[in-house]
Curated annotation (Swiss-Prot):
The keyword Transport applies. This is Putative sodium-coupled neutral amino acid transporter 11. Keywords: Amino-acid transport, Ion transport, Membrane, Sodium, Sodium transport, Transmembrane, Transmembrane helix, Transport. It is a multi-pass membrane protein. One of its GO terms (cellular component) is membrane. Belongs to the amino acid/polyamine transporter 2 family. Residues 12-32 have a biased composition (Basic and acidic residues). It comes from Rattus norvegicus (Rat). The gene is Slc38a11. Residues 1-34 are annotated as: Disordered. GO terms for biological process: amino acid transmembrane transport; inorganic cation transmembrane transport; sodium ion transport. Putative sodium-dependent amino acid/proton antiporter.
Length: 453
């Protein structure tokens, strides 16, 4: 097994104009074609995967007013950089994120990008398993006649069973276009989950005391919050796959897909973040469903829907992880046997790691600042600045010049803060307001940590 220099194929060996109608993804591996609506659902599904559950937590970190502003800003940067990547692919005549960076910055850049592009979806797969185990274990505990202490409804058992029966078989698909209908189902379930969160904001929120300074404009952990938001919004690692699945893909068509996808995603994300934070303020956990009481049947239904949503999102991340390894070590092509073997190895590794980790918040933060920030802010802008022949005063170049240093600050400062100032995690604990004797509290002057002990 050794590194294979990526090769450009077919008509894309020539330089292309951004408006060129050639596909930027070769057809041998991703031959299926999808409509624009299916592509929109794939992008939305990738955005509102596991990351959305941590957005209320990002409001707690940044301060609610600043958090909302940052959420809109990250969504705008995401939209801009996704279009920028495809423009860069057209300018360089390349058909993947990896080959774009390879042609722009050579082998060192290619190796760095491949590492990041592998790490992000792989860590996302781990977070999906954590969420699946946490949410579905609480769902099965509510079934009549089920012993809450049974090993068969433990998070570890559920992670293993869901992997073997659901996520692994779905991840064996070769064609991402076939996931369009699955992504549509996942998006519908997300709307149901949003309805549950909104309902509980109205019915449960007034009964939970608000923490001190709940509505302060800004907090010191705002950079970590950007990491969580970046984790939620990033889908750059699979944008060439989705672009290549379009019928007659063009930059103009891709721009419409991205604008629609981000608009839908930001509406869902802002509403979810607002309602989640309004309900729990300073008590908000990295996994919002950890805040709700286990006896709440409506939330139990929401947990079930979210668990299914995450399971259906998992294969998209596995696609990218497998593609990176295929391009780096196998020259972009796998036999059927190697395809199955590699997929099983990736899924198994993610499963084993997820069995050892309980707390979702730190996973979201670190993946956001270490992987998502460079993939969203730094690399797309660096590639475009080097490839584009537009004047320095062109709006795209000016925006790219802003994105690059901002991404570097988020990456370095966010990592330092995540390590030196880790947030509390109350995984598996029932919150204080779930007990009848505590629900009457009206004035809280203690820290959330004291009250969840």
């Amino acid at each position: 097994m050794s590194y294979q220099q990526p090769q450009l194929r077919g008509p894309l060996q020539r330089e292309t104009d951004p408006s060129d109608r050639e596909s930027l993804v070769s057809g041998h591996e991703h031959g299926g074609k999808s409509s624009q609506s299916a592509a929109v659902f794939n992008v939305v599904n990738s955005v509102i995967g596991s990351g959305i559950i941590g957005l209320p937590y990002s409001m707690k970190q940044a301060g609610f007013p600043l958090g909302i502003l940052l959420l809109f800003w990250v969504s705008y940067i995401t939209d801009f950089s996704l279009v920028l990547l495809i423009k860069g692919g057209a300018l360089s005549g390349t058909d993947s994120y990896q080959s774009l960076v390879n042609k722009t910055f050579g082998f060192p850049g290619y190796l760095l990008l491949s590492t990041l592009q592998f790490m992000y979806p792989f860590i996302a797969m781990i977070s999906y398993n954590i969420i699946t185990g946490d949410t579905l274990s609480k769902v099965f505990q509510r079934l009549p006649g089920v012993d809450p202490g049974s090993w068969f409804i433990s998070r570890h058992f559920i992670i293993v069973v869901s992997t073997v029966t659901c996520t692994l078989p779905l991840s064996l698909y070769r064609d991402i276009a076939k996931l369009g209908k699955i992504s549509f189902i996942s998006t519908i379930l997300t709307a149901v989950i949003l309805g549950v969160v909104v309902t509980r904001t109205i019915s449960l929120g007034p009964n939970i005391p608000k923490t001190d300074n709940a509505w302060v404009f800004a907090r010191p952990n705002a950079i970590q919050a950007i990491g969580v938001m970046s984790f939620a919004f990033i889908c750059h690692h699979n944008c060439f796959l989705v672009y290549g699945s379009l019928e007659e893909p063009t930059v103009a068509k891709w721009r419409r897909v991205i604008h629609t996808s981000i608009l839908v995603s930001v509406f869902i994300c802002v509403l979810f973040a607002t309602c989640g934070y309004f309900t729990f303020t300073g008590f908000t956990q990295g996994d919002l469903f950890e805040n709700y009481c286990r006896s709440d049947d409506l939330v139990t239904f929401g947990r079930f829907c979210y668990g299914i949503t995450v399971i259906l999102t998992y294969p998209i991340e596995c696609f990218v992880t497998r593609e990176v390894i295929t391009n780096v070590f196998f020259g972009g092509a796998l036999s059927s046997v190697f395809h199955v073997t590699l997929t099983a190895a990736i899924v198994t590794a993610a499963t084993l790691i997820s069995l050892l980790i309980d707390c979702l918040g730190i996973v979201l933060e670190l993946n956001g600042v270490l992987c998502a920030a460079p993939l969203i802010f730094i690399i797309p802008s660096a590639c475009y600045l080097k490839l584009s022949e537009e004047p320095r005063t062109h709006s795209d170049k000016l925006m790219a010049c802003v994105m690059f240093p901002v991404g570097a600050v988020v990456m370095v400062a966010g990592f330092v803060m995540a390590i030196t100032n880790p947030q509390d995690c109350t995984h598996g604990q029932e919150m204080f307001y779930c007990f009848p004797d505590n629900i009457s509290l009206t004035n809280i002057s203690h820290s959330p940590r004291q009250l969840t002990a």
